[in-house]
Swiss-Prot record:
Classification via Pfam families: MerR_2
Disulfide bonds: none
Coiled-coil blocks: none
Annotated family: Belongs to the CbpM family.
Function: Interacts with CbpA and inhibits both the DnaJ-like co-chaperone activity and the DNA binding activity of CbpA. Together with CbpA, modulates the activity of the DnaK chaperone system. Does not inhibit the co-chaperone activity of DnaJ.
Name under which the protein is recorded: Chaperone modulatory protein CbpM
Source taxon at top rank: Bacteria
């Protein structure tokens, strides 16, 4: 029997983990960069990836001086590149099996 641990963070914990203000998190949520469950900021719960995504978003916003819309697009494209690289590696492994035969 296996058990799954689901970690959810409230607004205060996310702000502490990502070292950002609540206003910053609200801005990030408004642009769809992170998507909490819950209707209001007081009720929001974030998954365990939210601190990492939030930190990346803030870094892009500050260091590259991107608007939040640009940050959302950049993060989406970076995720797509990572997914394509993973898929490419998997296909290379499969191809390698056929070539070795």
């Amino acid at each position: 029997m296996s058990s799954t641990l689901i970690v959810q963070l409230d607004m205060r914990t996310l702000c502490q983990e990502a070292d950002v203000t609540a206003e910053c998190v609200i801005e990030i949520v408004e642009h769809g960069i992170v998507e909490p469950s819950g209707r209001t900021p007081e009720d929001w719960l974030f998954d365990d990836q939210a601190p990492l995504v939030t930190k990346r978003a803030v870094k892009l916003h500050q260091e590259l001086e991107l608007e939040w819309e640009g940050v959302a697009l950049a993060l989406e494209l970076l995720q797509e590149v990572q997914q394509l690289r993973s898929e490419n590696n998997m296909l290379k492994q499969r191809l390698g099996r056929f070539i070795q035969m």
